[in-house]
């Protein structure tokens, strides 16, 4: 009866999530289920200058950036034809000709200038990344001047916030946002996006007429939707369900290694965590290999630092402490934390070492990590109170947490600077735990102004080592991304940077 109830509940959720968008006769419709779209992801919209909505605009084929990453995570021209650094602070970008927004207006230097100016006026991260002080346009060229050296400016322009849109159409109505992509928004809610093909797309007429993207955050419901044919493809399936689709001729999968990393920030306002020995004890208590093998079911690898080994500044460049609960207990004892009452948990001055582990639930693996961490830390003598909630932002804001675990793409630009500037600097937007180290700040400053690739790699590795050696953060695993789909789906493949999903070549027979 319990199983039947779950099945009925899943079916009800499925109907609610997927709606009843019926295909018109002869119309090719692609239905896509994902937990990666929605308010909790800060991407429920198509305005690239608002939070992470640019990810939706790029992922779902509404817009494009001046440059895009290839499979080796190297930036290549997309809307741009070429670029040239005039000096260390100035780059001149030549745009491709005869590209039009879905509004019918031509993409010109002036249009790109207007878009980028709106971007840096409204998007804090873009403003910090790009450091733009001036933009000029002439014909099909746009020249960008930055206040300081930005060696990876071209990489940053690949970020979805750099999606080029027609500002003359405004950004207040998602259905009117006009990009250059193969699809246009017909309707949009926090739960669903309906797109129709752009018949005037410069790259050729899209092979699919209509795309329906549904936000399905429950993993079992998502898997059931694909099994029942309610959707044609899914991203973010629970790893336990992947064999259902990998081992069936009716389906196929596309996988790739990514820099999406399961990591945890320490709250440096928590007195106990101000002691490096306690932070290191927490890190040594995390059984990363087991998490990658069991909870991720081999769809990830244990992390040494913030970056995976396939990047030149990741992997072997950093050496993290091994899983060692006994060694962790010794560190806690050195810090004055011992089990004085025999209850299995360490205490100090009559107070147990109780830590609050905050995470969110819309990424399937994070609650599993929280439960595993609770068990691992218990073995060390640390009491862990876990809080997997999609209201995590409120807890962060109120400071009601000690360890915050999340999944984050640490190198979406193919470079280490993105992670350092967003998480590690004292003023970083996502430095939730108020980590600060003047030596690290200095190294990041050097890295940010260095143009030579070899030196950038050397500095990035040095910064990573400093973070790991000081137990500033806990790096747990690097994720492999997998898309599952019906065998009749073509032109739908996973990409290392997690930006690109729906293209003109997507089709379903």
Kindly give the residue locations of the regions a language model identified.
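Append "and occasionally in soluble cytosolic enzymes with long acidic Gly/Pro-rich linkers
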Residues: 274-374
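Surface-exposed binding/hinge segments that line
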Residues: 84-88, 92, 126-168
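Aromatic- and charge-enriched surface segment that lines or borders ligand/interaction sites
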Residues: 81-123, 272
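Detector for C-terminal structural segments
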Residues: 285-315, 365-374, 396-509
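N-terminal lobe/hinge region of extracytoplasmic solute-binding protein
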Residues: 33-86, 117, 178, 497-498
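Ligand-site clamp/hinge motif
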Residues: 171, 199-244, 383
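A bilobed periplasmic-binding-protein/Venus flytrap-type ligand-binding module shared by bacterial periplasmic
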Residues: 96, 196-201, 258-281, 285, ...
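Gly/Pro-rich hinge or "lid" segments in bacterial periplasmic/extracellular proteins
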Residues: 74, 155-206, 210, 220, ...
